[in-house]
């Protein structure tokens, strides 16, 4: 067993690499194990050669007693250690009788004791290794005697069995080596073979195995499959093994009776058996070899090959083969054309597999055929559904040099009976991607032979007047009727010439014709052009003037897009036409074919092109025309004066954005510039709108494209502008917000739309900013407004929006805050946050009024409808605030009346009068002014209390005097009042006590912190602007801030009272709370407040003008002035501590006023009355 194992190990080693794991090693481990088991079993069963022979005889094999699998093993002969001379003689006789027995080259190798004395050779043979001339190789055939069973083995295994016989005195013992036809390497004995590391691979299968069936070689012509190799070169590759095997078999093999032919490549040996049955293709086997070799070596044709004739392909001598292959190539769906050509299955090898080639030669013509399917398709031999359509280069390949008549016939047969050659089809198709303009002019990435696929559009100087055959790039396959007259023999000398003749040299695009001849119905176009070859494409202009009727300038512009090859490969043919201008930033292409209109939208899948193309060109034209007109109408819908811009169809708004996001920025900027005239903006985008196939197709990716929101916002802006400052109109704030937020078809842009509309009202088309998210939160909406800079352009970039927001004054934030309530279900929550933030900012800045940074605040131009506002604030921010405040949701004058009545009663009461020289409350100029300013006429002006007070940054008030304020702080709220500063320090104690009382009353009276403030602000907005005195009074609110901070701690228990007083003092309170201690006012709301809004508020507060104007002036004086007015009114009225939110400014204001030293004792008594405190007030406060 050990010896057998060692022999098997050596036998399994590869002859070349001496590796057992090599694929060309003698055998598999599994086979080896099976063989060993079988050998052991048989060895012990037979016990000798005499017993083994009958078992191995052919008779036994035929009986099925042997193991056929074991005969496949290469080391079966290693088991035979002895053979008698009888066996050897019988073998000789068998070989002499066999007509196919191999001749013996020599018999020089002596054999002793049945074993060869040849020394072992290295595992891998070298150049200098002795050849088989020293030994004889025999392919043994089954001998007549039963002792020779290996022919039967050969029959079963199809393995050439060779025996090595050497002449000598001793009887020769033929050692059958079943090494898959491999030579024995002069190892005459199995023992030597197995002991040496040079053992041939036992499992090496011959490429051309010898097949014998019971003494009869089969097939008889098998010798044709055995090429003769005499090369002594070493082949390291796996094929080398086979080659070497063949080389060593060939010298002694008689199977090859014909004289050795010139060396044939290995590929031919592998493929020739397949070609045996295909003699009709090309009788010459060498041609077959060359053909397959070319296909093997050149799997894909180069670009030049795709465009120009192939010298290699011209080697084919059989024109019928090429013709049939071309026909098969052209019409794969019609098998009748190539059923008689058995070579067609191999025809595909002639065509390139390069993706670029496939696209240019196959995909484009296929699309063209699909799109240009002629109504008379039944007449044409070229089916439109053919996945492998014809191409010009293919026609030239048939015989590019001279046999063009045949090509012409073939083209006429396969394409149309209208003399439209096959080569015309891909070129005549609309939006042909391969444009044969001057080489080198094409965009980078295109083959040298191929011109810019969109060179027609990219290069305007390309037109050649010498060839007006091609009116438009979007002609269907039947549109080139004039080309049919071209003689293919004359014009097909070169592919470039052919294309030029087909009309690519001149295009209406290049010629800048006002309207290119888009692809009309194929039947109509072909018929028309038969009589009138289109010279300039103007023949079909009437059909497509609908595209031009829109009056958009893009129609007259010549496209200048330069597309690279990769663009159109994944998109329909005409898509680049529709989107080229978009990508380049130009409005659209001059010649926008209907196909482009339908398919150009990127939202449409590329698969849609073949689908709709199948519908038929005429139907496409009709539908496309209708669609175009429909989109033309839709395009101007949202620019119309309709009251509801959100009712505008989605397609006009979103479609253009989806089609091209690259062009959105310039277009949005243009939109921002054209804020006054939205129609201009819309008219500048007609091609994009037209390209949008349908709202349904566009609606899906609405949230995907951030550009879409700006577009929608732009639409809103345009509508609002047409409404003549919709915000400035008489609509209440709530109605406005609801109107803006009213669910639109898009729905996604609802929250952005109000922002866009509001900004548009200020000649800003914030929607132009392409950086907006699809559905920004209310905070983002606020940022949207804030980011909007003053001026016509909307240069709001994603980063700029944040930066500008921080820089912008409260006036910018006003619209956002105003929309906070509308956007959020809780109107007062957001406004409270804003107001509280404002108050805190103001408080943090100290008693001095915050200074506004003039450069930072973005001025919002006053709309014509805002003339009502009498804002004294010079800054545009105040104006913006006034604009926002124009639409009061709740009339604040109702509150003002109640307050007025109460104040009058208090003034009349004896308690109201204070001892000393204190002026009565009514006598106070500030009070009077506030009462007057709070007239109902001014109430309508203030729309958005939130936005006005916290957001708007008022301009610098001309007169701002500091007055001593009484800080009466309600719990959790800062009561900012713009009253004169207190002169005596002793008033602090009184203020603290009063603040407590006021807080108690405020808690009782204030209904709800959030709503109270909103209402108060609204009321304040409705009130007229206060006089300068009011401004002076309000300007001193910062002094109150310090007092309020101290009083805030004390007045936590007065929440109930503050609530009671809330309504009465609401008008003035929001401003007071904001101005006194913004830091303390409504911190909970502040926490929920968006961070950016807080920043904005902080800046607004930092500016004293904004804070003052917001409080005093509702509209006329600006948001700063409205808060002041509110403060004055609140002070004059019953001061009540404001509890949690500045939005209930009345209570805060009252409390703050009571805490701060009022300008008159009457005012202090009024506060005392509300607080229930009856104490002498300090001396008269300084004016």
Curated annotation (Swiss-Prot):
Ranges annotated as biased composition (Pro residues): 847-858
Compositional bias per record (Polar residues), positions renumbered to this chain: 135-153, 671-685, 975-984, 1069-1079
Source organism, top-level taxon: Eukaryota
Disruption phenotype: No visible phenotype. No effect on testis size, testis-to-body weight ratio, germ cell development or spermiogenesis. No effect on sperm morphology, count or motility. No effect on levels of germ cell apoptosis, chromosome H1t histone association or acrosome biogenesis.
InterPro entries, per the entry: Spata31g1-like (IPR026677)
Tissues expressing this chain: Expressed in kidney and testis. Expressed at lower levels in stomach, intestine, epididymis and ovary. Expressed at very low levels in heart and spleen.
Region Disordered, residue ranges: 109-153, 469-555, 661-686, 843-884, 973-1032, 1048-1087
Function: Dispensable for normal development and fertility.
Name recorded for this polypeptide: Spermatogenesis-associated protein 31G1
Organism of derivation: Mus musculus (Mouse)
Gene transcribed to yield this protein: Spata31g1
